From Swiss-Prot:
Its cofactor is [4Fe-4S] cluster. It comes from the Bacteria. It is found in: Cytoplasm. It is an enzyme of class 2 (transferase). HAMAP family: Lipoyl_synth (MF_00206). This is Lipoyl synthase. Gene3D superfamilies: Aldolase class I. [4Fe-4S] cluster 1 binds at residues 72, 77, 83, 313. InterPro entries: Aldolase_TIM, Elp3/MiaA/NifB-like_rSAM, LIAS_N, Lipoyl_synth, rSAM. Binds 2 [4Fe-4S] clusters per subunit. One cluster is coordinated with 3 cysteines and an exchangeable S-adenosyl-L-methionine. [4Fe-4S] cluster 2 binds at residues 98, 102, 105. It catalyses: [[Fe-S] cluster scaffold protein carrying a second [4Fe-4S](2+) cluster] + N(6)-octanoyl-L-lysyl-[protein] + 2 oxidized [2Fe-2S]-[ferredoxin] + 2 S-adenosyl-L-methionine + 4 H(+) = [[Fe-S] cluster scaffold protein] + N(6)-[(R)-dihydrolipoyl]-L-lysyl-[protein] + 4 Fe(3+) + 2 hydrogen sulfide + 2 5'-deoxyadenosine + 2 L-methionine + 2 reduced [2Fe-2S]-[ferredoxin]. It comes from Dichelobacter nodosus (strain VCS1703A).
Length: 324
C-alpha cells in the first residue's frame, strides 16, 4: 500500500496524512547533538533475515485484503521476515497513524482516520484463517478518542473469542493518557490472557524518548489493570536498551516492574529506524543480555526474554505457553 504523499498546498494537519522521518520528529524537544551523532557500526551478532519469500508475500496480501496493519511492517521491525515466514504477526489496530511522535519509533504520526467498525470482524477472520494458537494485538496511540481506543481493543477480543474460543490473546496497549481509569474499566470486563504495556526505557529518558508519556503512569496502568481483572491475568512489559542508559538503571526499572506485580519481561537492543531517529549510543553484547535475563529471573519474573533481536511480540506464542 502506497504511503500518502504530502503535496504542495495540502494542509499539514489534514486527516490521514502520514508523517515519517524528519517530518515526524522535528518538533520533539531533543538535544540536536543527540540526533547528529555518527551512526555506530552494527556488531556481528545483530543480523536480520530479509523479508522475502512466498509466505511473506502471502501474509502481506492477506493484510491488504482485510484492510489490516501489522506493527511488524509499520514500525519496520527487523524480525518481520522471520515472523511472516512462520505465519505469525502482531496486528496493529485502529489504523496506521499515531497521535504521538516518539523519536525511536517508525510508525507514522498525524491525524488518524475514524475507526473501522469492521476491523474486529476482519481481524478475527484473519487470525482464524492463519490457524494461530496465540495472537498479539497492539495499536497506535489514539489520544483523539474518548477512551483511547479501549473499547475497540475489547471489541477485537470479543470477536476473536467468538470465532476462535481456544486461541490465547495478548494485547500490547498504549498508556491511555488521561483515560487510563476508563480504559481499565472497559478492558477488565473483556480481559485478554496477557496484558502488555511497554515501559520502553528508563525514567530519565522519558521526556525525549517517550514525549507525552509518564513513567509512573505506565507502571500504575500495569498494576491497576491486574488488580481490576476478575480473573487471573498475566502482565508483561518491555524495554529497549542502547540509548545511553546504565545497567544499574535498567535493573532499577526491572525492580519497579516487579514491585508492580508484572510477570513477564522482554529486553531488546534499540535499532535506529532511520537517520532521523534517535541514534544508538551502544550495542549490548550477548553476555550482557544473558546477565539481564538472569537478574530478571532472580527478581521473580515468570519469563524473561532478553537478546539483541528480542521485541515485545517476538516468539510471544512460545513465551505465553510457559506461563499460561
Amino acid at each position: 500500500m502506497a504511503e500518502p504523499i504530502i503535496v504542495k498546498g495540502q494542509k499539514q494537519n489534514a486527516m490521514g496524512v502520514k508523517r515519517k522521518g524528519a517530518e515526524k520528529v522535528r518538533h520533539v524537544a531533543a538535544d540536536a547533538e543527540h540526533f547528529e551523532q555518527e551512526r555506530l557500526k552494527k556488531p556481528s551478532w545483530i543480523r536480520a533475515k530479509m523479508p522475502t519469500g512466498p509466505e511473506v508475500m502471502r501474509m502481506k496480501a492477506m493484510m491488504r485484503e482485510q484492510k489490516l496493519h501489522s506493527v511488524c511492517e509499520e514500525a519496520s521491525c527487523p524480525n518481520l521476515g522471520e515472523c511472516f515466514r512462520f505465519g505469525t504477526a502482531s496486528f496493529m489496530i485502529m489504523g496506521d497513524i499515531c497521535t504521538r511522535r516518539c523519536p525511536f519509533c517508525d510508525v507514522a504520526h498525524g491525524r488518524p482516520r475514524p475507526l473501522n467498525p469492521f476491523e474486529p470482524r476482519n481481524l478475527a477472520q484473519t487470525v482464524y484463517n492463519l490457524g494461530l494458537a496465540h495472537v498479539v494485538i497492539t495499536s497506535v496511540d489514539r489520544d483523539d478518542l474518548r477512551d483511547g481506543g479501549a473499547a475497540h481493543f475489547a471489541a477485537c477480543i470479543r470477536e476473536i473469542r467468538r470465532v476462535s474460543p481456544k486461541m490465547t490473546i495478548e494485547i500490547l496497549t498504549p498508556d491511555f493518557r488521561g483515560r487510563a481509569e476508563l480504559a481499565v474499566q472497559i478492558l477488565s470486563a473483556t480481559p485478554p490472557d496477557v496484558f502488555n504495556h511497554n515501559l520502553e526505557t528508563i525514567p530519565r529518558f522519558y521526556d525525549v524518548v517517550r514525549p507525552g508519556a509518564n513513567y509512573e503512569r505506565s507502571l500504575h496502568l500495569l498494576r491497576d489493570y491486574k488488580k481490576a481483572c476478575p480473573k487471573k491475568i498475566i502482565t508483561k512489559s518491555g524495554l529497549m536498551v542502547g540509548l545511553g542508559e546504565e545497567i544499574e538503571e535498567i535493573l532499577q526499572v526491572m525492580q519497579d516492574l516487579r514491585s508492580h506485580d508484572v510477570d513477564m519481561l522482554t529486553v531488546g537492543q534499540y535499532l535506529q529506524p532511520s537517520v532521523h531517529h534517535l541514534p544508538v549510543k551502544r550495542y549490548y553484547t550477548p553476555e550482557e543480555f544473558d546477565f539481564l535475563a538472569q537478574e530478571g529471573k532472580k527478581m521473580g519474573f515468570l519469563h524473561v526474554a532478553s537478546g539483541a533481536m528480542v521485541r515485545s511480540s517476538y516468539h510471544a506464542d512460545r513465551s505465553a505457553q510457559t506461563v499460561l
